[in-house]
Amino acid sequence: MVSPLHLFLQLLFVIYSLPDIHAVMIQDKVRTSTYANFILTNPTLFRDAVVLDVGCGTGILSLFAAKAGAKRVFAVDASDIAEKAEKIVKANGLANIITVIHGKIEEISLPEGINQVDIIISEWMGYALLYESMLNSVLHARDRFLRPGGVMAPSQCRMMLGLCDGSEIHKDRIGFWEDVYGMQCDTFVISLQ
């Protein structure tokens, strides 16, 4: 039997092969400009560095790293978006610096006999730090590929929680099953709770 986690991850690979989700992430100006500012305003950190982009998506962080002076960038993604990332890299004239690798970070080897990288970059946190389920993959990449004293960006996060009243959401999402156009469908609610 296939585990629910395995099914969830397979679904994520399908979703992340589509351009829509990447458009949403890149159009998040705070998120993308924060990465761009960090990478592009730290040329001494990135100059001549070997960089690993875990879960590269469209390759936007890899492009920033190459523009900041990275010697080599390995952009890894398990979904089919890697094929589009490769086209984007070529369209920007950076194929001599950026190598796109289509595969799971846990299963790939870096080419050119490279075993360690100087910097790992990744947009692993998704929404609310947990959505993309990438943290374990990034930690695997860190333990396997990051040289001692290397940089992981981002390297820390903080999650803050606040209480709220969800009764309206419950009413909209769960309560409405009690009367669906005059029909009783509340047996469906049991599977949602």
PLM ranges: what are they?
Residues 1-54, 58-193:
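Class I SAM-binding transferase module
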